[in-house]
């Protein structure tokens, strides 16, 4: 399904064709994208979302926090998705203007979903993704950003909202923030469960983005050797 596990290029846009191809071939399945610091994970996620919406798909986006979700949605707007196709329930403590379509509650979000049966993006934390009324409006894709911080339990609970799941993140960069203890490996993060004991995501499960633009080359070499089996460039 996925082919080479390593995405290589001088620009994040070089990676998009492979990701788009793999995402379109998912059939009630899941894949992941492991991107170390500075590899453009959120950029890739937002451009993939834009392509899916242009193809008529409905995409749900989740992370642990309102701020993280809104970061992805703002990138989706920057990518060119119209505000009218980007939905989210407003954080109750946030009264600022938004570039996307903000709703005051899950009930008003449901009304918006009912009135807009076509392609769109809906962002939310686990509370929104697991809301019984919201889940009635099925999505084609569920995309989780910073999936190394997103608990496996939350992913299982939210997974019923969509036919396909795509995880973006890096367990080597940010680990799960939840400290609760559960038996049987359930305490693992969503992406940590995918990767298992490996430093690099297995090729049959997704892609490793190998080029970072954030660090000095000499520092990148050290980090690559210590955490990424020498594959980060």
Tell me what each language-model feature is.
Residues 54-56, 63-67, 75, 79, ...:
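Conserved helicase motor core of SF1/SF2 NTP-dependent helicases
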Residues 1-125, 231-233:
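ASCE P-loop NTPase motor cores of helicases and related translocases
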């Amino acid at each position: 399904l996925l082919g080479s596990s390593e995405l290589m290029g001088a620009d994040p846009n070089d990676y998009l064709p492979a990701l788009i191809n793999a995402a379109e071939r998912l059939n009630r399945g899941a894949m992941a994208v492991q991107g170390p610091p500075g590899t453009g994970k959120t950029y890739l996620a937002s451009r993939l979302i834009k392509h899916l919406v242009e193809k008529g798909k409905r995409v749900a986006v989740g992370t642990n926090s309102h701020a993280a979700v809104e970061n992805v949605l703002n990138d989706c707007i920057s990518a060119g998705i119209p505000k009218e196709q980007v939905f989210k329930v407003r954080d109750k403590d946030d009264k600022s203007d938004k570039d996307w379509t903000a709703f005051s509650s899950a009930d008003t979000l449901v009304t918006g979903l009912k009135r807009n049966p076509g392609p769109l993006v809906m962002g939310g934390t686990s509370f929104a993704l697991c809301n019984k009324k919201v889940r009635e409006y099925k999505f084609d894709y569920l995309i989780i950003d910073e999936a190394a911080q997103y608990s496996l339990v939350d992913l299982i609970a939210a997974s019923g909202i969509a036919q396909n799941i795509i995880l973006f993140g890096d367990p080597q960069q940010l680990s799960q923030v939840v400290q609760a203890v559960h038996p049987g490996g359930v305490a693992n993060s969503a992406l940590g469960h995918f990767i298992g004991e490996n430093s690099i995501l297995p090729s049959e499960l997704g892609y490793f983005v190998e080029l970072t633009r954030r660090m000095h080359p000499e520092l990148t070499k050290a980090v690559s050797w210590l955490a990424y089996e020498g594959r980060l460039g």
